Amino acid sequence: VWEDYTYYITHGIGDNTAKNFAKRYSEWWCDRFDRVIVPTAKTENLLRQYGVEAPIDIIPSGMDLRRFAPERHSAKERAATRAECGVPEGKRVLLNIGRLAKEKNLEKILRVFPELHRRLPDVQFVIIGEGPLKQTLQEQAEALGVADSVSIVGSKPWEEIDRYYAIGDVFVSASHSETQGLTYIEAAASGLCVCAVDDPCLLGVFKDGVSAILSGDGDEQLLESLMLSFSPVGTRIRRNAVEAARPYSTEQFAQRVENCYLTALGERQRGLSPVVL
């Protein structure tokens, strides 16, 4: 969502003006098309709030789910990747993969981690990614006294990212800036229990307590959701995770996009397409 990223241009100076420009530009641009494809109802609702009037189709982005299949990774490979990420033998892994930036809300997760670690000392928090917040997160972990149990390992090649998902037990996110959140799907396809602060982008994607653990915004709520994720409930969700990710395959995505294009072509042939002024 462009309005969530204007800070990187304005650095806080005139940011409201930049956000309004992003909204107006989005409206102008989308209304020039016969149909608009968005990944979630959250994005559709946002565009409607901007004033977009063009027909909108909700088609979640697809991915090659086969590359994330848990059985692709041997115990030997997992052990080597865990060692690479600084995970001691016998530890369970709380995992986050993504850009280390303020909109991802990683500071919230780190705030609750000391208490999670006090209750579950066998949990290691592994953060994979790069971004402007990396040093801040390292300093926060040190200040909270959990630096030895937090591994911030930097970015990894996209071609190998499935290998890093494979070491996780629970995938955590507190972001509200996602339009779809592909990392949630990648984590589920990798057989992890997804624990996320609830967000409209997850509507229709996961069912709380069945295919993921969805938390409220408060720190205490996130802590309790993480505890639940490492309980037998989380173990059950992990068994269902791969099936929950199945609707997001590249094959289903391609079929839905083809149907959308056929609809747009049919409307244009019948003279039903909107006129762009």
Where are these regions (language model features)?
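Nucleotide-activated donor-binding/catalytic signature segment of Leloir-type glycosyltransferases, i.e.
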Residues: 136-156
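Short alpha-helical donor nucleotide-sugar binding micro-motif in glycosyltransferases
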Residues: 155-156, 163-168
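Carbohydrate-associated surface elements
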Residues: 42, 62
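Conserved acidic donor-binding segment of nucleotide-sugar-dependent glycosyltransferases
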Residues: 208-220, 228-233
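Membrane-proximal helix-turn-helix segments that form the acceptor-binding/catalytic region
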Residues: 17-35
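A conserved mid-protein helix/loop that constitutes part of the nucleotide-sugar donor-binding site
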Residues: 92-115, 125, 132-138
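Aromatic "clamp/platform" in nucleotide-sugar-dependent glycosyltransferases that forms part
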Residues: 176
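Short hydrophobic beta-strand element within catalytic cores of glycosyltransferases
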Residues: 193-196
